[in-house]
Amino acid sequence: MIRAIVTDIEGTTSDIRFVHNVLFPYARERLAGFVTAQQYAEPVKTILDNLRRETDAPAASTADLITTLFAFMDEDRKSTALKALQGIIWRDGYLNGDFTGHLYPDVLPALEKWKAQGIDLYVYSSGSVAAQKLLFGYSDEGDITHLFTGYFDTLVGAKREVQSYRNIAEHLGHAPGTILFLSDIHQELDAAEAAGLRTIQLVRGDRDPASHHPQVQRFDDIHPEQIPA
């Protein structure tokens, strides 16, 4: 019996184009000015200090760090410091009404159904927990954060590492086989499966021929009650 569902965001609950065509450019345009203006104020000061440790550059200037952050964006590096700064900038965008968090129309009804069935819902994304809460708090469907019991980001580990999913299972307090992980990336699902979790792959476009995981196109194609223990 599935007791908890952990879902990815990008390409799973939300269109990847929203992240890459709206969120990323919005943060990139504002990053340098924001970091320069806030470098001595919290939480930016601590984030920059963490970035110096992350890059093993204790003497790096703010200008150096900004250059590093732009390089990380170009590489799509899953840097905890970068994700934290992006999340702060996106908060202003959500609060100002510059955009709302995209949700596929099949997502909310399924989440509500699973919640009503007594299944705990969690999010695991490379974006910071703060950014996750913003997307679901200011979504196309309004604030749906009440549906989620908890959130995980790269602080629990990278999404293609088996140990990350062991950490999540330990935190949830459920046997791994009672946890279902949803993602559009088969390498993430491979890691989750190796940790003992159940897996389903969301394929919003063409099927993934390199994947052995069950593939569905919509959340309403997922029936956790039919997954054997």
From Swiss-Prot:
GO molecular function annotations of the record: 2,3-diketo-5-methylthiopentyl-1-phosphate enolase activity; 2-hydroxy-3-keto-5-methylthiopentenyl-1-phosphate phosphatase activity; acireductone synthase activity; magnesium ion binding
Recorded superkingdom: Bacteria
A matching Pfam family: Hydrolase
UniProt-listed CDD domains: HAD_EP
Catalytic activity of the protein: 5-methylsulfanyl-2,3-dioxopentyl phosphate + H2O = 1,2-dihydroxy-5-(methylsulfanyl)pent-1-en-3-one + phosphate
Family according to the record: Belongs to the HAD-like hydrolase superfamily. MasA/MtnC family.
UniProt KW keywords: Amino-acid biosynthesis, Hydrolase, Magnesium, Metal-binding, Methionine biosynthesis
Protein name as annotated: Enolase-phosphatase E1
Function (record text): Bifunctional enzyme that catalyzes the enolization of 2,3-diketo-5-methylthiopentyl-1-phosphate (DK-MTP-1-P) into the intermediate 2-hydroxy-3-keto-5-methylthiopentenyl-1-phosphate (HK-MTPenyl-1-P), which is then dephosphorylated to form the acireductone 1,2-dihydroxy-3-keto-5-methylthiopentene (DHK-MTPene).
Disordered: region residues: 207-229
Basic and acidic residues bias (residue ranges): 218-229
Cofactor(s) recorded in Swiss-Prot or TrEMBL: Mg(2+)
Note describing how the cofactor binds: Binds 1 Mg(2+) ion per subunit.
Assembly notes: Monomer.
A GO BP entry: L-methionine salvage from methylthioadenosine
The enzyme's E.C. designation: 3.1.3.77
Signal peptide per UniProt: none
Pathway: Amino-acid biosynthesis; L-methionine biosynthesis via salvage pathway; L-methionine from S-methyl-5-thio-alpha-D-ribose 1-phosphate: step 3/6; Amino-acid biosynthesis; L-methionine biosynthesis via salvage pathway; L-methionine from S-methyl-5-thio-alpha-D-ribose 1-phosphate: step 4/6
Native species: Klebsiella pneumoniae (strain 342)
